[in-house]
């Protein structure tokens, strides 16, 4: 083949490849342009959607307590926050806002349980010209006192012993000693009859009006921190899945708890630091709290609470600081203004008294909550009357709830 023919063939091949490359580049350019168009369209859609008015809020519900209402609702599309409106029958006012689209609950802290309040929630979009969407259907918060406890028996025990131990009638009455089988029968009654035993934290929330519990609710407490409460009562509380609290005398807690040998009548029969830590770790429903560090001694014939200055009481509190106590039961059930002020300043949440023996009401002073003593001579019928809330001798005539019933 001549050189001219070879050159012509090569030229034709070169032109063919050139055309192929041009088509390939054109296809690539078209693909890039197509992607750009799609991306631009998506961006337009995103921008359009981000500027859209939020959808109507749905699923609004109100969980109503004595002094607060917690609202919950479903997340609304195109909303980046929410605004809450409240109407108490006279006017609608802005009650609050959420911080983000995922914040689909809000709590109204100033609720008056005597007044029905209606709420609505609207979604907001900070990028939209029309910032608020259509509000939710209204929901009305109504407090139904018949569904919840309005007074709670707080039972006060002291020493718990086994059935084999000999205890005089006077000891059961004045020493408030109760036998194991008697305590178990009481716990079994509560369990079998649908009672709720509250922790101190739960009672605190109830007292503040922030939580509700069934009418059949009770709190069970033990004073002095005798080790029989740990060895005898504590296993029963775990057996029946009950909550309880022990108020320990700080000076008696140093060291390790002794073996249970009540027949020796040893003086050092108290719950110790190791037992306090163990119970807190394995069964938090059984609280260990303060009965002061060392304020049971009477001075000059006065009751302990009236015998000490503010500084003396504060020093006693500081000695108990390593335990992290936040609740206290007053020695002998009595207290002074000095003592109440110290507890507030020391960061305690609540304190319990025995003066007088009434059911606990929300109207009780947070640092003078009433309790009812239970002794070894309290019959089962008496116990049932007390925990039912129907024993009239323990109704506080000064409590608002009782005053309303008397009218």
Where do the protein language model's features map onto the residues?
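N-terminal pre-catalytic segment of deacetylase/amide-hydrolase enzymes
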Residues: 139-218, 371, 375-382, 386-407
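Beta-strand-rich modules
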Residues: 106-131
């Amino acid at each position: 083949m001549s050189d001219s023919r070879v050159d012509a063939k090569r030229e034709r091949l070169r032109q063919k490849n050139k055309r192929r490359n041009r088509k390939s580049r054109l296809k690539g350019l078209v693909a890039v342009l197509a992607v750009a168009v799609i991306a631009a369209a998506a961006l337009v859609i995103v921008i359009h959607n981000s500027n859209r008015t939020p959808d109507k809020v749905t699923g609004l519900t109100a969980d109503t307590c004595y002094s607060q209402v917690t609202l919950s609702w479903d997340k609304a599309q195109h909303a980046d926050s929410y605004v809450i409106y409240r109407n108490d029958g006279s006017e609608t006012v802005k009650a609050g806002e959420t911080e983000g689209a995922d914040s689909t609950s809000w709590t109204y802290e100033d609720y008056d349980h005597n007044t029905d309040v209606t709420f609505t929630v609207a979604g907001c979009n900070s990028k939209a010209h029309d910032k608020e969407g259509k509000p939710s259907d209204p929901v009305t918060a109504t407090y139904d006192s018949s569904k919840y406890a309005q007074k709670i028996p707080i039972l006060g025990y002291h020493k718990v012993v086994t059935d084999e131990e000999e205890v005089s009638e006077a000891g059961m009455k004045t020493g408030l000693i109760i036998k194991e089988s008697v305590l178990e029968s009481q716990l079994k009654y509560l369990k079998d009859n649908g009672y709720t035993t509250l922790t101190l934290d739960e009672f605190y929330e109830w007292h503040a009006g922030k939580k509700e519990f069934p009418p059949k609710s009770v709190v069970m407490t033990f004073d002095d921190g005798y080790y029989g409460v740990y060895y005898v009562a504590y296993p029963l509380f775990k057996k029946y899945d009950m909550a309880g609290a022990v108020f320990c005398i700080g000076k008696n807690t140093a060291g390790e708890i002794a073996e249970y040998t009540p027949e020796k009548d040893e003086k050092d029969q108290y719950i110790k630091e190791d037992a306090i830590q163990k119970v807190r770790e394995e069964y938090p429903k059984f609280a260990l709290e303060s009965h002061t560090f060392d304020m049971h001694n009477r001075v000059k014939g006065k009751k302990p609470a009236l015998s000490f200055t503010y500084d003396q009481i504060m020093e006693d509190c500081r000695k108990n600081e390593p335990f992290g106590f936040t609740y206290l039961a007053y020695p002998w059930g009595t207290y002074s203004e000095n003592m109440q002020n110290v507890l507030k300043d020391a960061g305690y949440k609540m304190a319990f008294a025995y003066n007088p023996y009434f059911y606990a009401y929300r109207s009780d002073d947070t640092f003078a909550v009433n309790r009812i003593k239970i002794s070894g001579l309290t019959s089962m019928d008496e116990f049932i009357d007390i925990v039912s809330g129907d024993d009239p001798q323990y109704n506080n005539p000064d409590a608002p709830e009782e005053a309303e019933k008397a009218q």
